[in-house]
């Protein structure tokens, strides 16, 4: 039996072909075990820091429309400002009309008639057919080439599932899950008919890494991950690219974090990373149609997934401890505030 490792300067002196094959096999497994993490490290670094994403014009030329849910604050607002700067007309959907009007006025003041803006105020928690019918009428005849599924809701504070208020639980499911499905089902048929389009759904580490005391929110984001990946496979043959965008903390009203850091970007930093890495997996190595585009989030996602496992006991315990601590601090603050009144 030929020694297949001789070209690499490794010679196995064994008359028995079985022994030679076994030793060769063990050596190859050892080499592969060493090479796999090295290759994975190179891939994640290239994806996060070197390789560009797909151009937005791949999915629709400037002058077509982008529909953004949860558009009046935080990440959604930043998507609106960024896409307007790139030449896309906007359909802004959120709960509060006054905030939508203010954002629309800011964009119109900056870009004038070059960027058209339409708004729709609706409360996704109510799941009203009339609201979705209004959305359908609003987008009728428009070339909506980009959909940003951004609207979302978390718990007011970390809470055990058995103590979660029924209304909070229902609102999370309606906003995070049902609203995303219904909006996407309204918008994507037009993309399919035009054979191009982009759907970005904002997910969360809570959907990848089980998060005790945010169980309903964590489950809703896990649902979005599975749904988005399945939808992406369905729509890919029709020229529509669907990507689930993973993130850790961002300075938004939902996170209640105001100060940025290496691990916590502001909305502009996060949106810039997202739009510059479309089609790149970032830290979500090996997860189809998914990206963790912000550099520190990507490195964190990759490290935890590769070396600990998304659903490992260690990750779940650490998550539980962190959110138990957040809950204690939130309850103490509520007590102090109550005494002041």
Swiss-Prot record:
It holds the Pfam family adh_short. Pathway: Lipid metabolism; fatty acid biosynthesis. Its main location: endoplasmic reticulum. NADP(+) binds at residues 67, 123, 131, 150, 217, 221, 250, 252. The chain crosses the membrane at residues 22-42. GO terms for cellular component: endoplasmic reticulum membrane. Belongs to the short-chain dehydrogenases/reductases (SDR) family. One of its GO terms (molecular function) is very-long-chain 3-oxoacyl-CoA reductase activity. Keywords: Endoplasmic reticulum, Fatty acid biosynthesis, Fatty acid metabolism, Lipid biosynthesis, Lipid metabolism, Membrane, NADP, Oxidoreductase, Transmembrane, Transmembrane helix. This is Very-long-chain 3-oxoacyl-CoA reductase. The active site is at 217 (proton donor), 221 (lowers pka of active site tyr). Component of the microsomal membrane bound fatty acid elongation system, which produces the 26-carbon very long-chain fatty acids (VLCFA) from palmitate. Catalyzes the reduction of the 3-ketoacyl-CoA intermediate that is formed in each cycle of fatty acid elongation. VLCFAs serve as precursors for ceramide and sphingolipids. It comes from Pyrenophora tritici-repentis (strain Pt-1C-BFP) (Wheat tan spot fungus). It comes from the Eukaryota. It is a single-pass membrane protein. GO terms for biological process: fatty acid elongation.
